[in-house]
């Protein structure tokens, strides 16, 4: 849909809407999709490109919450894995597998990571992106030759998700428009 069509849709509503979203970042776009999919007349206005601010400064990871596992927050891990699975289901073209290698330098790190990441894989179940595995020192150095050699004992590989945040933003805007909403950028709102 062209910008002129969106402006016309907005004018046909006589600039009245049920919900006005100011800001086209991830949160604003998500709110616009949710509102439009529920049948609300929603207008989203963004003063720059969609997802130009904080949303474009993300890690680009759709992580399953592995860091929460180290803190013992299992419920947060389960929630993060559930959300990652939902995102892979709803937008498989935007989420891809990303391998991470963690070098082990202390004797206790190999069993620590092996146990933790095995739990992570079990919690992920069918939503797992790949299996966590221990690595020999030579395998770690073959994949990451610039890693500090001294004291390296081996490593572990695990999988998490990565996504393209700008493609996600455009996909959300187009989905909101598809559902009957209006999303316009380069419109500044002065209150």
Q: What are these model-predicted stretches?
A:
Residues 1-19, 34-38:
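Extreme N-terminal leader/targeting segments of oxidoreductases
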Residues 59-143:
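Dinucleotide-binding Rossmann-like beta1-alpha1 core, especially the glycine-rich loop
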Residues 156-191:
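Helical element adjacent to the flavin cofactor pocket in flavoenzyme catalytic cores
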